[in-house]
């Protein structure tokens, strides 16, 4: 299907994973705007992850310092994702076409980013997925931080989570259809 328009937006200069883009795709007489997003990660270091997985209190000062470092990264991530979610939502609202939003939200389903971006849209996992839907292979066995949201005018036909470790995220796919005219 031909792409008739494209746009890439970076939120923060020199920030490798803080970006989104969209393309307008023509299918027969319909045009769909597809967003691909990668919201701010927590940017945990190996030391952070090691401490999260197995907190130690042998040295109280070191433990306190590591805990404060982790909390600061959570705060920074939440605040940046709030700004990003608001910007993406504004672009969704401006779209003259039905929208699909897919990507790495780096946030869970009860988060501000999830609800802001997914407002008045259907989540493909919720519609057709099953189980916990874990998409992140690290830290926790239950983190679903990757999403596919579709316009309510579209039907989600199926959702698939691929349990292959190709990166630190498991791939997700959905088949969607425009309603018959």
What are the language-model segments listed below?
Residues 82-100, 105-181:
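Metal-dependent phosphoester-hydrolase catalytic domains
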Residues 1-49, 148, 160-163:
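Structured beta-strand-rich core segments of catalytic domains in phosphoester-bond hydrolases
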Residues 44-55, 75-79, 108-113:
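Phosphate-binding glycine-rich loops and adjacent basic patches that engage nucleotide phosphates
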Residues 35-39, 61-67, 98-101, 125:
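Short charge-dense sequence patches
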């Amino acid at each position: 299907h031909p792409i008739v328009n494209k746009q890439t937006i970076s939120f923060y200069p020199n920030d490798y994973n803080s970006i989104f883009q969209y393309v307008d795709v023509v299918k027969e007489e319909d045009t769909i705007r597809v967003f691909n997003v990668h919201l701010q990660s927590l940017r945990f270091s190996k030391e952070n992850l090691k401490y999260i997985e197995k907190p130690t209190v042998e040295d109280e000062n070191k433990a306190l310092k590591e805990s404060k470092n982790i909390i600061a990264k959570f705060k920074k991530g939440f605040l940046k994702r709030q700004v990003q979610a608001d910007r993406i939502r504004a672009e969704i609202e401006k779209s003259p076409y039905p929208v699909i939003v897919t990507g790495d939200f780096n946030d869970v389903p009860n988060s501000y980013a999830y609800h802001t971006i997914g407002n008045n849209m259907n989540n493909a996992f919720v519609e057709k997925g099953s189980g916990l839907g874990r998409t992140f292979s690290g830290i926790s066995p239950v983190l679903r931080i990757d999403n596919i949201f579709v316009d309510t005018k579209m039907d989600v036909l199926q959702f698939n989570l691929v349990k292959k470790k190709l990166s630190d995220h498991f791939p997700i796919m959905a088949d969607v259809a425009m309603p018959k005219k």
